[in-house]
């Protein structure tokens, strides 16, 4: 599309919302557009992702906490809507793009009031609350998966499968081969627990790796993300087992570490699944059972069905089960390489381009293209989804 435009991205302040918003911001600016971000207080803690982007904090509210909590949430949402309307008078966006999370709600409500074109992007395989509420009124819906539970059938005509955008540093891994692996070479495992780590991984993974056969355990080199309170205990466990391990609470170079890894052990957040697919890395996934609408189980199903990952329910996640699954995947180097290739097949390396194309079309008032109304794969996969 010719001509520079302005776009507003609205996202909740967690990594699952902020990372795809960041990727789209970079792509839109690469195309010569101007971008502003609307988020909550949590979202302002990601300054490294939005160095060249205006960041505006809106009041928003969670629709919980009984009558009193609901009343306060509605007041905050209304205040956020009014503040967003003022922002739109000065910034004049061609479109407003919502990535879910409560801060996206007042931003999109203001866009409806101002008659600004709107797009929502759903990162998970289950439509989130905010996006479900907005889906009927937006101009277009972008999804990360063909099968999205709780996406109503009547919205298919305006829905496109774009995939989940990932950072440029992860896209770089797409063209790199799977790291060389033999029966005697170093076997690198990356353990990540989402944006804040996961204590259960710190409890189970070191002990599970310690149960592996000696000839396999001697080859291990571990990189693990931990919560701050688990850091020293986890380091001590690995030291006791004699397993080289780099333990930290935050990994600024996570894409590079992903590129070195032969196997990933992680939760099944949307960004993690997207990065595994783009990079082509096999994984053992432990979905977070308390995730809203159990969406991490749904996120994992495509990668698991393709043979790129194994899933362990958290109720069965113990050192013995982990050691068993690692041995099934790792005793033959060719098995891990095959799993990596299968993971790569379900990646969406062009997700950010597809999403940016959609946003430009909607922002330019151009006809919608490539909807999934007649997509037979989508039709088949949506059977059984909640309507």
Curated annotation (Swiss-Prot):
The keyword Disulfide bond does not apply. It is a peripheral membrane protein. GO terms for cellular component: plasma membrane. The keyword Cell membrane applies. Pathway: Cell wall biogenesis; peptidoglycan biosynthesis. This is UDP-N-acetylglucosamine--N-acetylmuramyl-(pentapeptide) pyrophosphoryl-undecaprenol N-acetylglucosamine transferase. Residues 366-387 are annotated as: Disordered. UDP-N-acetyl-alpha-D-glucosamine binds at residues 14-16, 124, 167, 195, 296. It catalyses: di-trans,octa-cis-undecaprenyl diphospho-N-acetyl-alpha-D-muramoyl-L-alanyl-D-glutamyl-meso-2,6-diaminopimeloyl-D-alanyl-D-alanine + UDP-N-acetyl-alpha-D-glucosamine = di-trans,octa-cis-undecaprenyl diphospho-[N-acetyl-alpha-D-glucosaminyl-(1->4)]-N-acetyl-alpha-D-muramoyl-L-alanyl-D-glutamyl-meso-2,6-diaminopimeloyl-D-alanyl-D-alanine + UDP + H(+). It is found in: Cell inner membrane. Its EC number is 2.4.1.227. One of its GO terms (biological process) is lipid glycosylation. HAMAP family: MurG. InterPro entries: GlcNAc_MurG (IPR006009), Glyco_trans_28_C (IPR007235), GlycoTrans_28_N (IPR004276). Residues 377-387 have a biased composition (Basic and acidic residues). PANTHER family: GLYCOSYLTRANSFERASE, UDP-N-ACETYLGLUCOSAMINE--N-ACETYLMURAMYL-(PENTAPEPTIDE) PYROPHOSPHORYL-UNDECAPRENOL N-ACETYLGLUCOSAMINE TRANSFERASE 1. Keywords: Cell cycle, Cell division, Cell inner membrane, Cell membrane, Cell shape, Cell wall biogenesis/degradation, Glycosyltransferase, Membrane, Peptidoglycan synthesis, Transferase. Disulfide bonds: none annotated. NCBIfam families: murG. Cell wall formation. Catalyzes the transfer of a GlcNAc subunit on undecaprenyl-pyrophosphoryl-MurNAc-pentapeptide (lipid intermediate I) to form undecaprenyl-pyrophosphoryl-MurNAc-(pentapeptide)GlcNAc (lipid intermediate II). Belongs to the glycosyltransferase 28 family. MurG subfamily. GO terms for molecular function: UDP-N-acetyl-D-glucosamine:N-acetylmuramoyl-L-alanyl-D-glutamyl-meso-2,6-diaminopimelyl-D-alanyl-D-alanine-diphosphoundecaprenol 4-beta-N-acetylglucosaminlytransferase activity; undecaprenyldiphospho-muramoylpentapeptide beta-N-acetylglucosaminyltransferase activity.
